[in-house]
Amino acid sequence: MKIPSQRQLAIQYNVNRVTIIKSIELLEAEGFIYTKVGSGTYVNDYLNEAHITNKWSEMMLWSSRQRSQYTVQLINKIETDASYIHISKGELGQPLMPHIQLKKAMSNTASHIEDLSFGYNNGYGYIKLRDIIVERMSKQGINVGRENVMITSGALHAIQLLSIGFLGQDAIIISNTPSYIHSTNVFEQLNFRHIDAPYNQINEINTIIDRFINFKNKALYIEPRFNNPTGCSLTNEQKQNIITYSERHNIPIIEDDIFRDIFFSDPTPAIKTFDKLGKVIHISSFSKTIAPAIRIGWIVASEKIIEQLADVRMQIDYGSSILSQMVVYEMLKNKSYDKHLVKLRYVLKDKRDFMLNILNNLFKDIAHWEVSSGGYFVWLVFKIDIDIKYLFYELLSKEKILINPGYIYGSKEKSIRLSFAFESNENIKHALYKIYTYVKKV
C-alpha cells in the first residue's frame, strides 16, 4: 500500500514537513515502510495477514520435523471428537480408567504437597517412583538399580530422547513392521535410515542385520509383546535369538514394551530379561493402563546411557511433571494399580471376545485376523481387493466412524486396526456392521 506524499501528510496532520520526513525515516529504519525512488513510499507487505501466512509456510518448509502423513493428521484432528465412533483408538475408554484409584492417589499426594520440590527437576525423575519401578522390574526378572531408570513423559517421549541423545545422525534403525512407529515420523527427523523387518518374518532379522554389518551406527527397534497394531508377540526363542545376534554384533536393542501389563493369559518375559550385557534399552509407560493424560513412562538402560539422556533432557524440558509422578507412585505403593490391572485384564479380554465373535459371524469369508493374547487390538486383513483409503473416507464422511487404515503403520496389506479398548460393546457392534456393509458394497 502506497502512503501519501510528504506534503499531503504535512497538510493532513497539520505539522511541519520536517516532522513528516523524520517520522518516515524512523519508520523506514524499523522496517515498517520502504521507499521506491521515483515511485513513492509503501507499507511493507509483512504487515499483510495473507503475506505473513505465506511467509510462515515458506519458513516451515525448512523445519527439521516433518509433518505427519495427511491421514494421520486427519485422525489426530478427529479422534478427540466425541460425535464419532472411534473403532481404532489406542487408549482406554472412560469406563475402564481407574477414576477412584486416581482420586485417592491425588488426595494422598495433596496431603503432603508441602514436602514436594516444585523447582526444576534433575532430568532423572522422582526417586521414589524410580525405586518402586526397580522393585517391580526385579519381580519380572529384570535386575537393575535406581541409576538405570529414568522417568519420561510417555514411551514416545522416551524414543525421541533416545533419537537425539543416544543414536547418532544418519543411524540405521531396523524395526518391525507394521508398527505404530511408522505413523509418528520419530525416526525420520535426524536422517535415520529406517529399515523394515516384517513382524511375520522376524526370524529373518539376522539376514537383514547382515546387510548392514559394516555400519557401526545402527540399532534395533522391537515391540516384543502385543505389537501395535497387529497384537502379535515374539516367542521366547525369537527373543533369545535377537539377543544373541545383538550381542554378537554389538547392536543395541530398543524394546518398546508399553502393553507389558495387559495380558490375558500367562505373561511372557521381556527381551530385557534375556539381556546379560546391557544391550537392551527397555521402554514402557502407564499411558495404556492408567490414562494417556498421566504422561508418565520410563526407560531402563545402562547407567551411562541414563546419565547421557538426563543431561540431554535438561536442555529440553527439565523433566516430567512431579505431580503426575507422585500420583503414579501412590497408586503403585498402595497396590491400587495392581488391583486395577486385574479388573482391566478381565474386562478387556471380555471385550476382545465380543469383537471376535462379531468378526467370526461377519468377516470370516472376506478377511483374516490373529487372536491376540493381550493389548488393545485386532488386526483385520482383507482377503479381497478393496481400496482402504476409499473405505476410510466413506466411513468417516458418511457414518462418522473413524478407522485407522493399515498403511499408516507401514503395512502393504489391505488392512485396518480395530480396537476393543475404547468404545462400548454397542458401538463396536454398530461400527463392525457398518464396515462390513461398506466392504461388501465396494
Swiss-Prot record:
Its cofactor is pyridoxal 5'-phosphate. Residues 2-46 form the HTH gntR-type domain. The modification N6-(pyridoxal phosphate)lysine is found at residue 288. It comes from the Bacteria. One of its GO terms (molecular function) is pyridoxal phosphate binding. Positively regulates the expression of the NorB efflux pump and negatively regulates the expression of the AbcA efflux pump. Binds specifically to the promoters of norA, norB and norC and abcA genes. Could also have an aminotransferase activity. Residues 6-25 bind DNA. The keyword Ribonucleoprotein does not apply. GO terms for biological process: alpha-amino acid metabolic process; biosynthetic process. This is HTH-type transcriptional regulator NorG. Keywords: Activator, Aminotransferase, DNA-binding, Pyridoxal phosphate, Repressor, Transcription, Transcription regulation, Transferase. In the C-terminal section; belongs to the class-I pyridoxal-phosphate-dependent aminotransferase family. The gene is norG. Coiled coil: none annotated.
